[in-house]
């Protein structure tokens, strides 16, 4: 460790604390630990050089060490400026793994760190990407476009693009082919979250996807667990740590009723809030109504609720006009990947009073205040520590299996977006049952024949909706 300096963390002295938390997390991540045991001898990721862009948490540290245990080399950055747990990053750095992340990065630092994961020593380029939100993939693709036409980064439309475009220009000034030289070596990407998956499908639709991609998000053991049950616990954890507010008796509006929104609504109702839901999709709206939630329009209830949570993955769902109407001390937060769901930029014209890290009072001219959490970024990671280890073991076991598949068999895939096969989805679930004392019933030969499925699965067709 004395000679290792290829990292940037808040405080390397936190490594001991981080290691203790990693040891605890491993006991709650049976899927990852079983995957280490199963594949360690084969070393299926030997030769893989993975550029990782995903929240640098304790749970992610267990993922990173699983990848390296299976033979991979890894360089890592966080995919959010507020989501890093500094002791986890320190533990990874102390283990000799390059990591570039600390809680509270500036946007300029964020994009510089995103470049760092592609800057491998001795001219060895990354050949795999593990992405969360698509920023690592976007960086190489946009930079490659800018090599041919600098005009694509000439006119930033927001603060994020300003930092990104400036970072690309700096690297092009050093090497006019910085991005294309790295892009050509990438064999594939595995994408963690809904927002990043949307980007990949759009690239595929436009014919611009440069390599195969595996959509980890839509594995059942990711989206129906991480997105639903993870958010069900981590949303209120973030709100409570940030504000100490009594949720019971409050009116809460959840914007979006997908898997994430469903988990958020359940947790808020479980603590005694009256929960309303906004939706654009009639099916999701009907689901919400059948669960007993009132389905409303934001422009009609902005002045009637106490807590607002965005969970849409879209842009501008809470507007400046909505916030002008809100009650004094209304709490506004987001649990979607990017900070675009709330029009935070429109609030910069007003006075900001920082209460503590990631908690701000926005003071309007009439003296009214609203409480903005994590500056509109992920509240569960900005104001708390994200999802529990057990549910992240589901998601990250999928990630490891996807990395193994793409690295070993990427040449068999077209430049399209794929999902993991059903038998692997069921395998991930199976690996987690014993930890919670669940025992499966086994089909008899007669029963298996009657419903026309193999005794050991898969048990459902690909189109089955869990």
Curated annotation (Swiss-Prot):
Family statement drawn from the similarity comment of this UniProt entry: Belongs to the adenosylhomocysteinase family.
Listed under GO biological process in this entry are: L-homocysteine biosynthetic process; one-carbon metabolic process; S-adenosylmethionine cycle
How is this protein named in the record? Adenosylhomocysteinase
Q: Which gene encodes it?
A: ahcY
The reaction(s) catalysed by this protein are:
S-adenosyl-L-homocysteine + H2O = L-homocysteine + adenosine
Query: Per UniProt, where does substrate bind?
Result: 57, 132, 192, 222, 226
InterPro entries the UniProt entry points to: Adenosylhomocyst_ase-like_sf, Adenosylhomocysteinase-like, Ado_hCys_hydrolase_NAD-bd, NAD(P)-bd_dom_sf, S-Ado-L-homoCys_hydrolase_CS
Residues reported in the UniProt entry to bind NAD(+): 193-195, 227, 256-261, 279, 314, 335-337, 380
Q: Which UniProt keywords apply?
A: Cytoplasm, Hydrolase, NAD, One-carbon metabolism
Keyword presence, NAD: yes
**Which GO terms fall under molecular function for this chain's record?**
adenosylhomocysteinase activity
Which organism does this record belong to?
Chromobacterium violaceum (strain ATCC 12472 / DSM 30191 / JCM 1249 / CCUG 213 / NBRC 12614 / NCIMB 9131 / NCTC 9757 / MK)
């Amino acid at each position: 460790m004395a000679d290792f300096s290829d990292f940037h963390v808040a405080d390397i002295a936190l490594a001991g604390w981080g290691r203790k938390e990693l040891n605890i997390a491993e006991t709650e991540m049976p899927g990852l630990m079983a995957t280490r045991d199963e594949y360690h001898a084969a070393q299926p990721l030997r030769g893989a050089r993975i550029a990782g862009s995903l929240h640098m948490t304790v749970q992610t540290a267990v993922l990173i060490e699983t990848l390296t245990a299976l033979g991979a080399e890894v360089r890592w950055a966080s995919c959010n400026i507020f989501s890093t747990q500094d002791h986890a990053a320190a533990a990874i750095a102390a283990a000799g793994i390059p990591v570039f992340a600390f809680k509270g990065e500036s946007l300029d630092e964020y994009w510089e760190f995103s470049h760092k994961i592609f800057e491998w020593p001795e001219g060895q380029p990354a050949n795999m990407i593990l992405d969360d939100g698509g920023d690592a993939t976007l960086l190489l693709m946009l930079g490659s476009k800018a090599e041919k036409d600098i005009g694509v980064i000439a006119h930033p439309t927001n603060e994020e693009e300003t930092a990104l475009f400036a970072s690309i220009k700096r690297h092009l000034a050093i090497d006019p082919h910085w991005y294309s030289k790295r892009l050509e070596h990438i064999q594939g990407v595995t994408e963690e979250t809904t927002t990043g998956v949307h980007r990949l499908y759009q690239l595929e639709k436009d014919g611009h996807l440069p390599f195969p991609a595996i959509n980890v998000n839509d594995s059942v053991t990711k989206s129906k667990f991480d997105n639903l049950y993870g958010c069900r616990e981590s949303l209120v954890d973030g709100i409570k740590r940030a504000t100490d507010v009594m949720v019971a008796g409050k009116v809460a509006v959840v914007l979006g009723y997908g898997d994430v929104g469903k988990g958020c609504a359940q947790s808020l109702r479980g603590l005694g809030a009256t929960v309303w839901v906004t939706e654009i999709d009639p099916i999701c709206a009907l689901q919400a109504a059948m669960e007993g939630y009132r389905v409303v329009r934001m422009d009609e209830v902005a002045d009637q609720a106490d807590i607002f949570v965005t969970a849409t993955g879209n842009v501008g769902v809470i507007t400046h006009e909505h916030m002008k109407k809100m009650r004094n001390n209304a709490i506004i937060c987001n649990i979607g990947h990017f900070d675009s769901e709330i029009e935070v930029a429109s609030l910069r014209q007003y006075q900001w009073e920082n209460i503590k890290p990631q908690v701000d009072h926005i003071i309007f001219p009439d003296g009214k205040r609203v409480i903005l959490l994590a500056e509109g970024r992920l509240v569960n990671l900005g104001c708390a520590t994200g999802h529990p280890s057990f549910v992240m073991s589901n998601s990250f076991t999928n990630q490891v299996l996807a990395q193994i598949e793409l690295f070993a068999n990427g040449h068999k895939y077209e430049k399209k977006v794929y999902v993991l096969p059903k038998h692997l989805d069921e395998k991930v679930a199976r690996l987690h049952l014993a930890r919670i004392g669940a025992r499966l019933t086994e089909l008899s030969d007669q029963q298996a024949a009657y419903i026309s499925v193999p005794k050991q699965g898969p048990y459902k067709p690909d189109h089955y909706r869990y």
